């Protein structure tokens, strides 16, 4: 056992280094939770966030090649195309100004006139991932305004979907929801990393867990890569155990520097230690990240 806090303060360049993707294809999920795992408090998620959390949320979107979400999450949260002013603009150098959003929908229950589809810029057209049995007329209608990928016959095959995205050059993936999608990613062995913000409050019972779907036969071991602290909010970054070696240069902490008031780094050298939790037990009940809910906090 060792004390992680307090640790050295960091500056934005150090923060960007902490969250850089490793080489190759990598799928990261981003969640938020109260200390007791609740998804919201009194119907809102504002109490679960902080300035530093929102700062990292924007960074994760900036670093991603594509943002992946399920159709139910997109409809419930009224997704819109990512706006350039929301990102760390200098970190997009050499890439399109904003990442596209990829929506998974087996039945294509999506509105072609929605902002997400109709207002997407040419460099980041919305991607719709569907099935071979989806209504052909709906597929043709959506294909006029979005890029459509067929992955699977009756249900979306996530391995095929992720391969198709990688073939298009989208190798750094960020999953923002929902719990069903995250559960399917875990079951398919596609999840590489979980970023989880834990807010310092007890919200009480009532929210769903971080992962939905079939019960896992055993807990999924995680490695804790780092913890950041922002006024009591803990920003944890876990990597699926054995997906990376502890000796990878990508795992090493940044140099200590004078950081500013927002976040503090709380990792012990390049060492890793295994989280003694499953994704459900570690996070309890958590909120998938959505731009609408986070802007409304």
Task: Put a short name on every predicted segment.
Residues 1-253, 263, 293-297:
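Enzymes that bind and transform nitrogen-containing heteroaromatic metabolites
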Residues 247-248, 252, 256, 279-284:
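N-terminal compositionally biased or targeting/leader segments
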């Amino acid at each position: 056992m060792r004390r992680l806090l307090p640790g050295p303060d960091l500056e934005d360049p150090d923060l960007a280094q902490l969250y850089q993707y490793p080489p190759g294809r990598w799928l990261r999920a981003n969640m938020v939770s109260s200390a007791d795992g609740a998804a919201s408090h009194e119907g809102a998620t504002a109490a679960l966030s902080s300035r530093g959390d929102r700062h990292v949320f924007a960074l994760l979107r900036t670093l991603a090649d594509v943002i992946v979400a399920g159709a139910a999450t997109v409809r419930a949260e009224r997704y819109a195309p990512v706006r350039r002013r929301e990102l760390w603009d200098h970190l997009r150098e050499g890439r399109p100004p904003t990442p596209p959003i990829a929506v998974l929908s087996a039945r294509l229950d999506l509105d072609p006139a929605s902002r997400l589809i109709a207002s997407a810029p040419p460099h980041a057209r919305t991607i719709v991932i569907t099935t071979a049995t989806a209504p052909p007329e709906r597929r043709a209608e959506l294909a006029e305004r979005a890029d459509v990928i067929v992955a699977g016959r009756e249900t979306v095959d996530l391995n095929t979907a992720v391969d198709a995205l990688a073939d298009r050059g989208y190798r750094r993936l960020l999953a923002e929801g929902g719990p069903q999608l995250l559960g399917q990613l875990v079951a398919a062995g596609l999840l590489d990393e979980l970023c989880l913000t834990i807010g310092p409050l007890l919200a009480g019972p009532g929210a769903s867990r971080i992962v939905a779907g079939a019960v896992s036969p055993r807990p999924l071991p995680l490695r804790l890569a780092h913890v950041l602290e922002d006024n009591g909010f803990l920003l944890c970054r876990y990597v699926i155990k054995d997906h990376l070696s502890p000796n990878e240069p990508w795992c090493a902490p940044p140099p200590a520097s004078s950081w500013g008031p927002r976040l503090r780094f709380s990792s012990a050298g390049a060492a890793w230690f295994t989280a003694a939790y499953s994704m459900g037990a570690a996070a309890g009940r958590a909120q998938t990240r959505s731009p609408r809910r986070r802007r409304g906090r």
